[in-house]
Structures are given as C-alpha cells and as structure tokens.
Amino acid sequence: DPERPPVVKYNPAFDAPSQAKHPLRMLTPHPRYSFHTQGDGKDSFINNIKDHRVEVDGFYYWIIRINADDAAERGIKMHDLVKVYNDQGAVVCAALVTQRLPRGSTHGYESCATYEPLGEPGNSVDRGGILNLLTPKKSQIKKGHSMGNSTALVEIELWDGKAEHNVAPAVAAE
C-alpha cells in the first residue's frame, strides 16, 4: 500500500492547497484539564481555570492560542474575541496571545465544548468552542478509517459580532 509504506516518510497534508486562504495550522490535542466531557459540566469549577476558558461579558469562551507575531498582524490582543474559521465552519474563541507557538501555528483543545450556534445551525458561527467543526471529515488514507481531526488549516480574525458564516458544501471522501 503506497499510502502506508514500511518506512515512514513525509507526505504533505491533503489540505495544503488551501493554505493561501487559511494560512494558520490549528492543532487540536486532547484537553489538559478534563477528559472529553467527563467532569466538565460547562458550568463547573473548570470554567475558573484561566487556561481553559475566558469569561467575556458573562460568557465563558473557549481559548485559541496564537503566536504573538501572527496576532499582531491581525490586530489581535490578549482575550479578544476572535473568529476561527475555514470552509467548514467558524468558531468564536478568546485569543491567548503567546510566543510558545511557532509562527503559523494555533492551538486549541479539541473537546469539552458545547455546540452553541448563534444562528442557523451549520450556517452560523459557534460560540461554544467546538473546534472539531473545522477539522477534516475525510479519512487520512483511502484504505482505512483513520481520522484526521487533530489538525486543520484556518484563518483567525477579530470577531465582528455577526452570526452568519457561509460553509462550503460537504464533499464525499475520496
């Protein structure tokens, strides 16, 4: 199988062609402070952990970490509400500006969020923090069922408060 050679080698990501439109690589590892949704009741003590969520105007927003230089280019400051988006959807998060990520990379935990669309589900931004809305839906390889949902190409901008977001039509896996 050419997709799974005996010696592992680098293969460019299948979403690489969209990098001009969505230049930031978003990493979505397992959460540090809870396991998926267990122990994370969305209104629990976990909201008070400063690296987990940020309260803005009475709502606890999911955090997206962004390199300080990338943030400065976009006019983003610490705890600004930002729209993280690509052709699959959009999520509103609170920005955590850091030098701990290389340029071109962002980081947000993949779960423990609640889907809260601000308009028509599927055609509006989510303020609950479901970053997996932005990750690929297709299998990593043709002859297997491996998920590719730990990374995605995105763009981040200051959120203008609008609920609408046009989503590209779903495409079947190749």
PLM feature segments, named:
Residues 1-50:
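Long, low-complexity segments enriched in small/aliphatic residues
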